[in-house]
Structures are given as structure tokens and as C-alpha cells.
A protein has these predicted regions:
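Conserved ABC ATPase "signature" region
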Residues: 4, 8, 15-32, 85
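Conserved ABC ATPase signature
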Residues: 37-41, 45
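Catalytic Walker B motif of ABC-type/P-loop ATPase nucleotide-binding domains
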Residues: 62-65
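Helical segment within the ABC ATPase nucleotide-binding domain
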Residues: 76-90
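Conserved H-loop
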Residues: 91-97
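Conserved beta-strand-loop-alpha-helix hinge in the C-terminal portion
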Residues: 116-146
């Protein structure tokens, strides 16, 4: 029911809602958890359920505002890998807002660094890595160099 909510709010019939919700649940790997209450799901599973809910509407662009900030680092990496596959398989684009430099560089084709107040763009980085990105990219020397440059900009250009 939770995953069907947006479809219901958009006036879709029950049968169509159920079909779209089930397809989205399968896309994010939550089969078998359809009848579980949100409080019984792990943090990563809650993020997947949220993504499934949005996927039911098949938007061309997703806004991700700190979507994985509440999960541990390993779960975050798994969710990044899975979300990247969804980008590729489902053909949508995403605007990713994050405080994690590693996540920004891994998930993006372009990273924009913003100042605190007022929030202005102070730096822009084109990320050269091809999709699909392999998890081990996070240990690549060029990945580390770019992440370091982003970090430097976040500190106001100081080492």
C-alpha cells in the first residue's frame, strides 16, 4: 500500500496501481517484503521502498536529496551501486544532493560545489569515468585525486 500511494494520489485505478507497485518493488529488490510495515524494515530497505514508491510514476528525472545519509557506509555504497543500475536500466536522470564527496564523485557525471551561505556554486568538476561504474572505482588513484580536489574546494580552496 505504501508503494502504491503516489499512484493513488494521481487517480490510478487499483489494478494499475498494484501492477506498477509490484514492478517497482521487484526493481529495487524488495520482493517478499510487500506486507511488512515500514518500522520493521532496515534503513536500506526503507530507502529502497521510497525509491520504489517514486518509480511507480516513471519520472524522467529524480531529485535525490541526501537519500542515503541515514545508512552506514557499506549500505550506502550498495545503494549507490543499485541506484546507478536503475539509472542505466530504466533510463532516468538524477540530481543528487549529498554531503558525501565519495558518493558525489561515484554517482555523478558532474559535481557542483556550493558555498554555505548564501548557497552559490563555487566550483564545477566534470567526472570522467564511464558508466557503468564498478565498485572498485572508489579505490582508483584518479578517483582519489578528483575527490581530493572537491574536498579542497569545500574547504574554501585551502589544503
Amino acid at each position: 500500500q505504501n508503494v502504491e500511494l503516489l499512484c493513488e494520489l494521481h487517480g490510478m485505478q487499483k489494478e494499475e496501481r498494484r501492477s506498477l507497485a509490484q514492478a517497482s518493488i521487484e526493481l529495487v529488490g524488495l520482493e517478499g517484503f510487500e506486507s511488512h510495515y515500514p518500522k520493521s524494515l532496515s534503513g536500506g530497505m526503507k530507502m529502497r521502498a521510497s525509491l520504489a514508491r517514486t518509480l511507480t510514476l516513471k519520472p524522467p528525472v529524480f531529485l535525490f536529496d541526501e537519500p542515503f545519509g541515514a545508512v552506514d557506509e557499506i549500505t550506502r555504497e550498495h545503494l549507490n551501486d543499485e541506484t546507478q543500475q536503475l539509472f542505466l536500466n530504466e533510463g532516468f536522470a538524477g540530481l543528487f544532493i549529498t554531503h558525501s564527496i565519495t558518493e558525489a564523485v561515484f554517482m555523478s557525471t558532474k559535481v557542483l560545489v556550493m558555498s554555505a551561505r548564501p548557497g552559490n556554486i563555487v566550483a564545477e568538476f566534470d567526472i570522467p569515468f564511464e558508466y557503468p561504474r564498478k565498485p572498485d572505482l572508489r579505490f582508483d588513484a584518479e578517483f582519489a585525486r578528483i575527490s581530493g580536489e572537491v574536498s579542497k574546494e569545500l574547504r574554501g580552496g585551502h589544503s
